[in-house]
């Protein structure tokens, strides 16, 4: 469990580093400041959709309660699951871009996860869509106030989005043991 935690923190750190670099790129700053425009929404969908796919590929495969060493997850066996930062990316995309961006990134991430395989993976599509929509509606409320979400608010939203994902896993994943 400690090993999985450390590996997941590495993945979260990578996402934070990429986000930090993007926020400091002037072009991306302009996209964020004009996030209500459709052209900006499309760009945010492409950027966060790519991040979500990267999160799926760099996830940690778990089979038979063991971490399976992999560098890039292109396929999962039917008895394996994956620990990744996909839900974090979907939540952030919704907070930043609103419900259109969040739900579209959720669909991209969910369908990509289904393509990866693994047991009973189809529930990731509606789960990711719901996460994107909820985070998006919360993000759009913040945008109307012309503020970006604080770190604390984002952390709480992220935890809630992960809980939604876990509820879907609990009810729809079946027995993976």
Residue ranges, per PLM feature:
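Detector for methionine-enriched segments
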Residues: 1, 8-9, 38, 142, ...
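Hydrophobic transmembrane alpha-helices
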Residues: 2-91, 101-102, 106-177
